Amino acid sequence: MVSLAFNGFGLAATADLHLKVAPDSAFWRAVYAQWEHGAWVGCTFWDLIMPAFTFMVGLAMAYSYVRRQREGHTTAQMFRHACVRALLLIALAVFLTTGTGKETQWIFTNVLAQIGLGYPLLFLCWNRGYRVQALAAAAALGLTWIAFVLHGGSTAPGAGVTAAWSAQHEAHLAAAWHKNANVFHAFDVWFLNLFPRASPFVFNVGGYQTLNFIPNLATMIFGLMAGEW
């Protein structure tokens, strides 16, 4: 988070300057690549920003609801509070995504929306003990894996994906995770088109999907476990 606030401590800008002088430098290319999202397959330092946010949400919940419990709040009251907070986060996410545009952008893939979608489920794991929490995290990841595999993949390029890109990426079982040709993408093609839109939703350029909040819930639970440790 500190790195994000300080724009990567200037490393991205420094790497960019060095690459202008020595564009073939493998070292500075590797440094610069850490400040961009990985191209679907892979992971960079920049890709860890959202998991860091969601981990801290779980960490904060461990303290927040203990305080509320000590103040005499019932479980029902705290769950209602968690649901209201979740709705506010989702509404704020839509507002920020829409910006100054004339049409409301019903997109639920930014970090606030993803936290909001998983927040009530995270609360249900609060104060349940490490075993239940670990099982919940495993279930979130395991059910995601099963859903992707059962849905299957495609050897054809997904929406917004070129044939050349497709040929260089997912194959065999991994094809189930192909960009814009997987079960979460199929859900969004149905779900996001339930909202009023100027044109039908076809794909997300970055491959981000609403149901990403399910595996992301595991990261939030890990934060909760750390906070309760």
Predicted segments with their positions:
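Active-site-adjacent bridging/hinge elements
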Residues: 25-34, 90-98, 191-200
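N-terminal signal-anchor module of multipass membrane proteins
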Residues: 1-70, 74
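Transmembrane alpha-helical segments and their boundary/interface "anchor" motifs
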Residues: 47-52, 67-97, 103, 108-119, ...
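Transmembrane helix-loop junctions in multipass membrane proteins, especially transporters and channels
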Residues: 11, 67-72, 101-102, 149-160
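Hydrophobic residues within the alpha-helical transmembrane core of Major Facilitator Superfamily
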Residues: 2-4, 121, 142, 223
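Specific transmembrane alpha-helix
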Residues: 50-66, 112-124, 214-229
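Long hydrophobic alpha-helical segments that form multi-pass transmembrane helix bundles
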Residues: 131-218
